[in-house]
Amino acid sequence: PWFEDRRHATVAQIKEQLAYREQNAKEHENFTISRKIGDEEYFMYIEEVSGVPTRFFVTRLSDYKAENPDIISFKDVISCVTDIQVRDEEIKQKNAEGQMVSCNPRRYKHHHDFYIKMEIRNNPYFDDIKFRINGSCITLETVGDIGGGFGGAALAGLFQGVGLSTTGVQTHSYRNSSENRRYEECRMICERIEQAVEDGKR
């Protein structure tokens, strides 16, 4: 599934890819799922031997054998990082003249998407993978600025999203417990994936 250069492949390369897919499907028959990490979008299935992570695959489908996702050895993971992509949006309101103006104090929405990015070696078809953790965008709202700046308000929203203190800062996030909870859950999922990779690389 991570192989994306089929259009430019030769007949021989396509045959090699099909043989690779067939061998991967056979490996699934011998893959023992020890645990699963994920909640909304993609799930990481991990095989362990004596409590040590050895292999994994990533899929969003419950019928994963039909998809035949690539089985990857943890020893072949060069790096694993969490990538939180944020899109900031100022919330505005209409004034008496019907113009859209900033609120006082200013209000913002911060849209978050969590991704895991891995560098992979010893695979002829891909050298990196990236998959999304949250199923839909996580939106946190903040009001007020830190030091009078937009970026400061966004930063405070992020801090509060993960439960960090913003004491003394003139900002707070609105009480959207479900979105704050989703943010924290996705952050913890990413931490567990990173830890599994570290444990498997040892």
PLM feature spans:
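Intrinsic structural disorder
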Residues: P1-W2, V77
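Anionic N-terminal interaction surfaces
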Residues: W2-E67
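Generic detection of short hydrophobic beta-strand segments and adjacent strand-loop junctions
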Residues: F31, R35-I37, I72, I129-F131
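A structural detector for beta-sheet-dominated domains
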Residues: S34, E47, T59, K75, ...
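Short small/polar-residue motifs
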Residues: D39-F43, D76-I78, S102
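Short coil-to-beta-strand transition motifs
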Residues: A66-S79
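Acidic, Ser/Thr- and proline-rich intrinsically disordered linker/docking segments
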Residues: C80-R202
